[in-house]
Amino acid sequence: MVSIELDYKKPPFWIRLLGTPAITWQSQPFTLARRQARALLYRLADDLHPAPRDRLIFLLWPDIPETTARRNLIRLLSYARQALPQPELLLSDNTAVALNPDLVGSDTAQFARLCAADDAIGWETAVSLYRGRFLNGFTLPGSPEFDYWLSQTQRQYERAYLAVLRKLATAKADMGDYP
């Protein structure tokens, strides 16, 4: 069995996406005024993998010319770097954008890691992280592609949550640990 590190140290910039979204910097609430900047951070924080610029452009501005959308992304990244407590939280090059994995963490990335564990303690921790529907209450008006991504991702996490609950229930039953 693979054991999961339970004394996981949260990075200084933490993004909660399961349930009502929330961002903290050094355990203090942090807000970004622009909804589109929050949408960008939420998308990047989902799995903490670099996202191709082309996909982000299509996600945030599907109905405008590509050159205009590229300029919009450049401006949005500039705004985000200025608004974030440290500009190095956001990494980008000519092809992709990412959050700095050394400084940024998310409940969804931790949830996925724990769901893949092979022990009941990891599964219990995963269940405790699931505080509700992915990005519950968050929308990005005027971006049907973001809405589509959001609904697909919500279903993905709901399925993962139900699967980890089944694994945990089976493990508890096998150990005779049930009410």
Describe every region a protein language model picked out:
Residues 1-179:
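Intrinsically disordered, low-complexity protein-interaction/activation regions
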